[in-house]
Amino acid sequence: MIGRHGVDWWRAARRAGLRAARIAVAAATPTAAARFGVDPDVWQRELVRGSVVSPDRLARTAAPLVRRLLRARQVRIRHPNGTDLTVELLRAPPVVEDGRVDRADRRAGRLWTQIPTGVVAVPLVPGVAQGIWESNRPTYNRFADPPVTLGARFTFRRGRLYEYSFDRGGASFAREYARGGRGRESPGALTFGLNPAISRAPEVAEVAAGTVGLLLGGNRSLGGRNPSRFAYLTTLAEANVELDGLPFLEDGRAVPGARPGDRRRAKVPNE
């Protein structure tokens, strides 16, 4: 896998101006499917469908989200499962993964993409996150034991992870977190999925349209300030998201640009 090459390899790749793509379907093997407990044919078909969504379509979907995120400061994420988390966006351009590695990506040191893709990522201000985040999608990591975690529940106080629990598979997170080092406890970024053909495929959860992801740990590659090498991403589908009190996503679907007078129409779970 490209992502597991060493520092020297990446240094040489940058000097050479290399661009690369990780083709996810190549890793959707029967062995991996058995480890994850999924049907390999279903997994592969979903990845293929997601891979043929064009970069232009993903870029068009991303554009209105990026425009609103650029103007926003505070984000509140809610869901009937108990999620109620408030974070603050760093003053940095959102990163759009649309399947192309362009000049801006290379200037920022991002040399590769994944196929399928489709995600907008925004770094967060440290020391601000407050509330509860509960994932409702599995997190897959073929190199972990166990390789699947479910029901990640994180409680944040004053920008730091205060406590955590999992419905299943939490031992693998606990081991990674214990050796994560400084910065591991800080939420690093939010992600917003764009790809309409991805729903439940392992290892690409963050690109599924209608999902919000929370990255715990380092965010330097996204323009953030946290240099931690620890990174753990969990995802939440069908969330309600507000930007500065205005509706941004309702049940995971984008809300057209709202005006200040629309503030009261922001959907509250269980209304």
Feature locations, PLM:
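Long, well-ordered mid-to-C-terminal structural blocks that present hydrophobic/aromatic surfaces
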Residues: 125-175
